[in-house]
């Protein structure tokens, strides 16, 4: 049963991949937006992304985008400094 849950979460994390050219254009603008819907719709700046399932040290995107060592992520759920099911931009 746990394997099915893990497989479902991994599938959701990979559902909306972003191409390399989109990633560069987003980074050059300094800010980004996430696709609408239920999955990966919350923009966050996170320092660590573990296999697209869990992102650590996350915070909301500031007016200048992500600064320092944090990278832009689109997360399904973000709470208490962590993001769940995140795609790194």
From Swiss-Prot:
In terms of InterPro entries, this protein maps to: Cerato-ulmin_hydrophobin, Hydrophobin_sf
Query: Which cysteine pairs are covalently linked by disulfides here?
Result: 34-74, 45-66, 46-58, 75-86
Keyword annotations from UniProtKB, A to Z: Cell wall, Disulfide bond, Secreted, Signal
Q: What is its main location?
A: secreted
Species the sequence originates in: Trichoderma asperellum (strain ATCC 204424 / CBS 433.97 / NBRC 101777)
State the family it belongs to: Belongs to the cerato-ulmin hydrophobin family.
- What job does the chain carry out? Aerial growth, conidiation, and dispersal of filamentous fungi in the environment rely upon a capability of their secreting small amphipathic proteins called hydrophobins (HPBs) with low sequence identity. Class I can self-assemble into an outermost layer of rodlet bundles on aerial cell surfaces, conferring cellular hydrophobicity that supports fungal growth, development and dispersal; whereas Class II form highly ordered films at water-air interfaces through intermolecular interactions but contribute nothing to the rodlet structure.
Q: How does it assemble?
A: Homodimer. Homodimers further self-assemble to form highly ordered films at water-air interfaces through intermolecular interactions.
Which CDD domains does this chain map to? hydrophobin_II (cd23508)
> Which SUPFAM superfamilies does the UniProt record give?
Hydrophobin II, HfbII (SSF101751)
Name the UniProt record assigns to this protein: Class II hydrophobin 2
Per UniProt, subcellular location reads as:
Secreted; Secreted, Cell wall
Provide the leader sequence positions: 1-15
* A GO CC annotation given for this chain: extracellular region
What triggers production of this protein?
Expression is slightly induced in the presence of root and stem powder of Shanxin poplar, as well as during carbon or nitrogen starvation.
């Amino acid at each position: 049963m746990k394997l099915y849950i893990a497989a479902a979460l991994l599938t959701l994390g990979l559902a909306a991949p972003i191409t390399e050219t989109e990633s560069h254009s987003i980074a050059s603008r300094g800010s980004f937006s996430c696709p609408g819907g239920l999955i990966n719709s919350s923009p966050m700046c996170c320092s660590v992304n573990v296999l697209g399932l869990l992102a650590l040290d996350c915070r909301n995107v500031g007016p200048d985008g992500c600064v320092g060592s944090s990278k832009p992520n689109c997360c399904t759920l973000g709470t208490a400094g962590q993001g769940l099911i995140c795609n790194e931009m």
